[in-house]
Amino acid sequence: VRSRLLSIPGFDFRQDYLDCQYKELTIPARDGEFALDPEALHIWPRGGSMMIALPNPDRSFTCTLFWPPTGPGSFDEVRTGEQALAYFTAHYPDAVPLMPDLVADYDANPVGSLVTVRCGRWSANGRVALIGDAAHAITPFFGQGANSGFEDVAELDRCLGEADGDWSVALPAYEKARVDNANAIADMALANFVEMSTKSGSRVFQAQKSVQHAFERLLPEHYVSRYELVSFSTIPYAEVVRRTTVPSQARSVAAGIAHRVAAPLRSLSGRGGAS
């Protein structure tokens, strides 16, 4: 469908491949239990590359390598399972004892590409529209690929309801509501790759995250992190971006602190008046 729509003048389409590919490996359960903390996101940051591990219901972990296609530490350099074992021993030594099937997994599992798709228009003539990855494929670094597609469905359903089932009205409205949000989560996912692969190993970055978590605990009505808003709310992605700029979050923290300070002062003032 998208290929046919590309023949329409002005139907812009872009796909950008990340200079990084991926391969999945496994950390199996150990004696029927998780080998790592299942409540944590495990990241092995290595500059422009990384490995992550996410828990599964069977208490194993799926590990994903995000490596460049060529150059040092790339899939082109590390081609076989035996080469992977040597590379892991040097660069991911703590993971090697957790991965008894590393050699076999590395040889068996394919290398995949990561691409961001953007379309300037999603609908045509009030009769056809793109949805999900056809309109806005994104990289997986915010875990929102499927969810953003589900949001398309919810928005299209809402627009059809408001248009009394008139597709010629609903489809342009759906497109208008979703394009900016799709671009926003695509950008946030790409930014999160840099954060995870390059910044997460920095002590300064870890200190910043600790401060953010403290604000979330102490000022829950005023400060919410970007991750929380994206993952655990239905706030539109573009609105999340606006709310989580540094100036906006600084204002939220200031308002929260002012509220915390003012509350006991008002209480003291009230008691003073009563006496």
Predicted regions and their residues:
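Conserved FAD-binding catalytic core of PHBH/FMO-like flavoproteins
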Residues: 1-114, 118-123
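Non-transmembrane alpha-helical segments in soluble domains
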Residues: 2, 85-89, 157, 175, ...
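Conserved mid-domain beta->alpha element of the FAD-binding
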Residues: 25, 110-201
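Amphipathic alpha-helical interaction segments
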Residues: 52, 69, 75, 95, ...
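A structural signal for well-ordered alpha-helical segments within the folded catalytic domains
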Residues: 82, 151-154, 209
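Selective for proline/serine-rich intrinsically disordered segments
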Residues: 91, 95-98, 138, 218, ...
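C-terminal helical "tail/cap" subdomain of flavin- and related membrane-associated enzymes
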Residues: 158-275
